[in-house]
C-alpha cells in the first residue's frame, strides 16, 4: 500500500524510534507544533509578557478550526477541555416544561453522563440509549427521540471501538422533533471530514490532543449562529462578555456568538500548539487523510482477522471503524509490553485500540497486529 504522506513523516520525530498508533489518546507531536510551543516559551522568557501575541494565536486557531469544520469564526468558542464545553452547554440550556428530555447513549464518553446527570432540572428526563454490541443504530434514535426531547448528544466516533455514526440522519430525527443535535467529535476531527452545516449539527465539541495533533489544554466548541441566542451561559467569565462589559463587575453582557461560552484565559501554550497543528491538517486536507485511512483501516481489519484477532466491531463495508479495537485478556499488561517494544497503543476497558493517523504506514500497523496476535 502506497503511503501518500511519506514526506510528512519527517515532521514527527517519534516515528524514527517508535510505532505510534495511539492517536485515539494522544496524537504524535510534530516539529511545527514543537516549534510553536517553543515560540510561546521563548516570547515569555525573553520579553516577560506575550499577551498580545497569545491572543493573536488564539484568534488564528479559532479561525483555523472554523475552516476545518465548515463553520464561521463567530460560531467557535475556545475552552480548556471538552468537559468544560459540555458543562457550559448543559448549564446554559434553558429548561422548558414538557421539552426537557436529554438523549445520549451508553457508548458515549462517561463525562457526558456525569455532566448531564449533575443538572438537577434535567436529571429525571434523561434517556440513555442502550447499545447493541457496541453500536447504536438509527432506529434506536427514531424510537427514543420524541417531541419532549430538548437535546440529543451523539459521539461521531465511538471512543472504544471506532464505530462511526450517521450524523445527518440523526440530525434529521432531532430536528423533526424540534430538538438540538450536540456532537462529540473528539475522536473524529482531524481524521474524518466534518461539515457542520451540511450535516445539520447544532453544537459540536472537539479537543486538540488526539487526531488534531495538539496537546492537552484546549478544546473548541461550535454553536450554530441560528441557535446561539437561546443560550445564556451560567458557566462564564470575563472573556465570555461583550468587550465593553468585561471589566464592569455589575453589568455583565454575554458576548455575541459562541464566545459567550468562554470563561477565563485558556492555556496559551496549548493554543500555540493547536494553531500549528490545525495549520498542518488544513495544509494536508482531511479529505485526503480519510481516503488513505480508509485503505489503512481496511488492511488492518483484514490482516487482524487473518491473524485470528477478535476485533470488537464487525467489518460490514459501510461501517468500517476509524480504529482497530482488539479484545485481549489483560489490556494493561499488553499495553505495557507493547510500549516496552516502542509500540504506542491505547488500552481502554477490555480492548487494545490501534489508532493510526495519516503519518503511519501499513507496515507499522502490520507489525503491531502481528505482535498482538502473538500475545492473544
Across the structure, where does each feature detected by a protein language model lie?
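Pyridoxal 5′-phosphate
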Residues: 1-376
Amino acid at each position: 500500500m502506497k503511503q501518500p504522506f511519506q514526506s510528512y513523516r519527517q515532521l514527527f520525530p517519534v516515528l524514527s524510534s517508535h510505532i505510534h498508533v495511539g492517536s485515539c489518546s494522544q496524537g504524535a507531536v510534530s516539529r511545527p507544533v514543537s516549534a510553536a510551543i517553543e515560540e510561546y516559551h521563548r516570547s515569555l522568557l525573553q520579553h516577560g509578557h506575550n499577551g498580545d501575541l497569545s491572543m493573536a494565536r488564539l484568534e488564528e486557531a479559532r479561525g483555523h478550526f472554523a475552516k476545518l469544520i465548515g463553520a464561521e469564526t463567530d460560531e467557535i468558542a475556545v475552552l480548556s477541555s471538552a468537559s468544560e464545553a459540555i458543562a457550559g452547554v448543559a448549564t446554559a440550556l434553558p429548561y422548558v416544561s414538557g421539552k426537557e428530555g436529554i438523549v445520549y447513549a451508553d457508548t458515549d464518553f462517561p463525562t457526558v453522563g456525569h455532566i448531564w446527570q449533575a443538572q438537577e432540572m434535567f436529571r429525571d428526563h434523561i434517556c440513555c440509549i442502550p447499545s447493541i454490541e457496541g453500536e447504536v443504530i438509527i432506529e434506536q434514535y427514531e424510537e427514543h427521540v420524541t417531541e419532549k426531547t430538548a437535546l440529543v448528544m451523539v459521539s461521531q466516533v465511538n471512543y472504544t471501538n471506532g464505530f462511526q455514526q450517521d450524523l445527518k440522519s440523526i440530525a434529521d430525527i432531532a430536528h423533526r422533533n424540534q430538538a438540538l443535535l450536540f456532537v462529540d467529535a473528539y475522536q473524529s476531527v482531524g481524521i474524518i471530514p466534518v461539515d457542520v452545516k451540511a450535516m445539520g449539527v447544532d453544537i459540536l465539541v472537539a479537543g486538540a490532543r488526539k487526531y488534531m495533533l495538539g496537546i492537552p489544554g484546549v478544546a473548541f466548541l461550535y454553536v450554530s449562529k441560528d441557535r446561539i441566542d437561546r443560550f445564556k451561559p451560567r458557566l462564564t467569565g470575563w472573556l465570555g462578555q461583550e468587550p465593553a462589559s468585561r471589566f464592569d463587575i455589575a453589568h455583565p453582557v454575554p458576548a455575541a456568538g459562541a464566545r459567550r461560552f468562554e470563561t477565563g484565559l485558556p492555556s496559551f501554550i496549548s493554543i500555540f500548539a493547536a494553531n500549528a497543528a490545525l495549520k498542518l491538517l488544513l495544509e494536508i486536507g482531511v479529505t485526503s487523510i480519510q481516503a488513505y485511512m480508509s485503505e489503512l483501516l481496511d488492511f488492518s481489519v483484514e490482516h487482524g482477522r487473518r491473524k485470528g484477532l477478535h476485533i470488537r466491531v464487525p467489518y460490514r463495508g459501510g461501517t468500517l471503524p476509524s480504529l482497530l479495537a482488539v479484545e485481549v485478556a489483560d489490556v494493561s499488561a499488553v499495553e505495557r509490553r507493547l510500549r516496552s517494544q516502542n509500540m504506542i497503543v491505547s488500552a481502554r476497558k477490555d480492548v487494545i485500540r490501534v489508532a493510526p493517523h495519516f503519518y503511519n504506514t501499513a507496515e507499522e500497523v502490520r507489525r503491531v497486529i502481528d505482535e498482538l496476535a502473538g500475545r492473544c
